Amino acid sequence: MTSILTNIAAMAALQTLRTIGSNMEETQAHVSSGLRVGQAADNAAYWSIATTMRSDNMALSAVQDALGLGAAKVDTAYSGMESAIEVVKEIKKKLVAATEDGVDKAKIQEEIDQLKDQLTSISEAASFSGENWLQADLSGGAVTKSVVGSFVRDASGAVSVKKVDYSLNTNSVLFDTVGNTGILDKVYNVSQASVTLTINTNGVASQHTVAAYSLESLTQAGAEFQGNYALQGGNSYVKVDNVWVRAETAATGATGQELAATTTAAGTITADSWVVDVGNAPAANVSAGQSVAGINIVGMGAAALDALISGVDAALTDMTSAAADLGSIAMRIDLQSDFVNKLSDSIDSGVGRLVDADMNEESTRLKALQTQQQLAIQSLSIANSASENVLTLFR
């Protein structure tokens, strides 16, 4: 049946053309954006996952920047510590030279003073972005410095930022800006041999041997004793069987000295019936040293110089340990930086598998749709021409 009111063939061809046009728009959008899931309407589940992971990847990018900043801080501190170690080695060399008979110690002291000034200069200059890890205010205890290490999303979806911590304490900073507890400004107390102490408890005597030691001094009331020897308020203390006993040299004329404390806290010193016999503890064996920053060898005897060299060597040991810690932190930051880079690439790859368009497939499909569109246009043209043929019947 041929109708001039309803052209069914033209309607069918037009519907086909509309469908092809819609498919072409979708395919062209995939080709132009490179995404087969560009919005939630395309695939809500994949779009949601991709959006979340892209957000996490942006956070990882910030972590990468923070790791770079942290690496710069650590590298600066390490370089400063390494330079300071070389200077302290030179100071130790000067002290060894000063033990030679007939040496002008005043001249050597002048050289040491210059080296001490260099240590101060290194410590003050080892700063990056306002952060200085070689000197700190330790009056309130250790100070923790942190470097952002990673961004984590757990199984429940909760997010957190993990950090790499580094403690600025008496064994890691060169100078305490308020007190005297840094490696270079604290006093190292050194003994050159073991000391045999006779302890009398209510008339019962027993002997105890305290081995050679190199330990820190106490700087404030209430601080805890550390190690086997400490200096507080001008008094020397030794730790025997977990009891702190105050000792004096034979030069004081005292045959004994009352006990110090029954606990490890300096603020709880009490009188007791303990007595230490110092007859076997000559002055050379229980000696107070100097800080590296306060070294003054003018007029110093051979025994004191030997003890001072041991103290400087103890400071070098602490500095070497601190440099090793900084090196370990630097290595960890480098490893974490590499991991974050790889993790970011993995996330990009995973998101791509979910939402990226296959350009080979899309280009092939676009070519096919263009051919279909041309055929649909031709079909519509043929269908429209059928109505024109009706006019020939009336000629």
From Swiss-Prot:
GO-annotated molecular function: structural molecule activity
CC terms in the record's Gene Ontology section: bacterial-type flagellum; extracellular region
Family matches, as SUPFAM superfamilies: Phase 1 flagellin
Main location: secreted
Matches recorded under InterPro entries: Flagellin, Flagellin_C, Flagellin_N
Entry's localization field: Secreted; Bacterial flagellum
Signal sequence region: none
Entry keywords, A to Z: Bacterial flagellum, Secreted
Protein task: Flagellin is the subunit protein which polymerizes to form the filaments of bacterial flagella.
Recorded family membership: Belongs to the bacterial flagellin family.
Protein name: Flagellin B
Gene: flaB
